[in-house]
């Protein structure tokens, strides 16, 4: 009985196929339905392709505008269209700093921003969006950033009010300090040393100052 039922179904399908092949009304209807389905699919696919193309054109236009104008605004920070502090300030002559002198250059009391790493003082004014009063690393402005960079700490606990000789840092942390020092040397102007208590500042000639700046350029 099951086999018979199966035979009926198979024969019925076969008959339908033959009728379709003979051009019977059932076959014509199936063909028309298939044609309609294909046409609808093509229409939908074409519409989707058109929408994708339009979106791609809009994104391309937006990207070109960003490349031309967005980067400029991003680099200039909040004062878009205005010169950055680094652009308006003359290059700082090389000199040495005590902790008290260094603290004056925090970006708030003066537009110039300095910080120290491993006994070296760097002018980071051109990175004011990072080291300025509102920047994510503004806590280091006008301070010795060595301990904070070595311990990855952005809290006031990483700052010392007195000279920090870093003697309690381990070998890995000191290596990190030296790596940070090298990175700052590559990116920012080295403007002098951070003086230890009682240490006298060095006198730098114009020739030494020019030579150091030439190396950095």
Curated annotation (Swiss-Prot):
Further comment: Non-classical progesterone receptors involved in extranuclear signaling are classified in 2 groups: the class II progestin and adipoQ receptor (PAQR) family (also called mPRs) (PAQR5, PAQR6, PAQR7, PAQR8 and PAQR9) and the b5-like heme/steroid-binding protein family (also called MAPRs) (PGRMC1, PGRMC2, NENF and CYB5D2).
Tissue: Expressed in brown adipose tissue, white adipose tissue, liver, heart, skeletal muscle, brain and adrenal gland.
Keyword Iron: no
Occurrences of domain Cytochrome b5 heme-binding (ranges): 96-195
Pfam families to which the protein is assigned, alphabetical: Cyt-b5
Residue stretches spanning the membrane: 40-62
Modified residues (Phosphotyrosine): 204
Protein name, entry field: Membrane-associated progesterone receptor component 2
Knocked-out gene: effects: Adipose tissue-specific knockout mice adapted to 30 degrees Celsius show no difference in body weight or white adipose tissue (WAT) mass but have reduced brown adipose tissue (BAT) weight relative to their wild-type littermates. BAT loses its distinctive reddish color. In contrast to wild-type mice, which activate thermogenesis and preserve body temperature when exposed to cold (4 degrees Celsius), mutants rapidly become hypothermic and die if not rescued. They have a total heme content reduced of about 60%.
InterPro entries membership: Cyt_B5-like_heme/steroid-bd, Cyt_B5-like_heme/steroid_sf, MAPR/NEUFC/NENF-like
Annotated membrane topology: Single-pass membrane protein
Biological source species: Mus musculus
One GO location term (cellular component): nuclear envelope
Modified residues (Phosphothreonine): 205
């Amino acid at each position: 009985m099951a086999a018979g039922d199966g035979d009926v179904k198979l024969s019925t399908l076969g008959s339908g196929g033959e009728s379709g092949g003979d051009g019977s009304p059932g076959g014509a209807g199936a063909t028309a339905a298939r044609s309609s389905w294909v046409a609808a699919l093509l229409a939908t696919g074409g519409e989707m392709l058109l929408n994708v193309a339009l979106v791609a054109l809009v994104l391309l236009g937006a990207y070109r505008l960003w490349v031309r104008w967005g980067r400029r605004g991003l680099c200039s920070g909040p004062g878009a269209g205005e010169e950055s502090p680094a652009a308006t300030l003359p290059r700082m002559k090389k000199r040495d700093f005590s902790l008290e002198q260094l603290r004056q250059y925090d970006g708030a009391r003066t537009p110039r921003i300095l910080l120290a790493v491993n006994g070296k003082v760097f002018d980071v004014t051109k990175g004011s969006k990072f080291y300025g009063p509102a920047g994510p690393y503004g806590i280091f402005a006008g301070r010795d950033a060595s301990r904070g960079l070595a311990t990855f700490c952005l809290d006031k606990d990483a700052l010392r009010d007195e000279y920090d000789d870093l003697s309690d840092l381990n070998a890995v942390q000191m290596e990190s300090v030296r790596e940070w020092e090298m990175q700052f040397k590559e990116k920012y102007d080295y403007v002098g040393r951070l003086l230890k208590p009682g240490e006298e500042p060095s006198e730098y000639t114009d020739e030494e100052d020019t030579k150091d700046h030439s190396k950095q350029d």
